[in-house]
Amino acid sequence: MNYQFHHVGIPTTEVRPGERYSAPFKMYTSGGEAPTRIQYHRFEEGCPLHPLLQTKPHVAFKVDSIDEAIRGKNVILEPYFPFEGFKVAAIEENGWPIEFIETSLSEEEIWGGSAYKNSVIYPESE
């Protein structure tokens, strides 16, 4: 299995510039544009994501196969496609969340925002 660093996600309670809102997840996301790929996530009450994802930082890795990456692990976010061509899942390991991403999209497509339009995670984006 090949693990390639993708980003770090940090929960925050602070409103940050450039936030995108995800109504299905009751979550705001900002950051990620810099080469360090640090994202910030702010959650509303009633967010359906696992409490570990809402309270602890996570590291995300691109993998060749999400199914292989999560096999036998404590899955806290079942595999799904937040937007076309981008499959995500998360596990808990030693009390910390780890996200896995399986995609053929380029980094520009992912971070540029065009892939998000009218997606599961951002259904109302333009």
What feature does the model see in each segment?
Residues 66-73:
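Short amphipathic alpha-helices within nucleic acid-binding modules
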Residues 62-66, 103-105:
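Beta-hairpin (beta-strand-turn-beta-strand) motif
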Residues 56-58:
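Short active-site oxyanion
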Residues 9-11, 60-64:
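Short hydrophobic/aromatic beta-strand micro-patches
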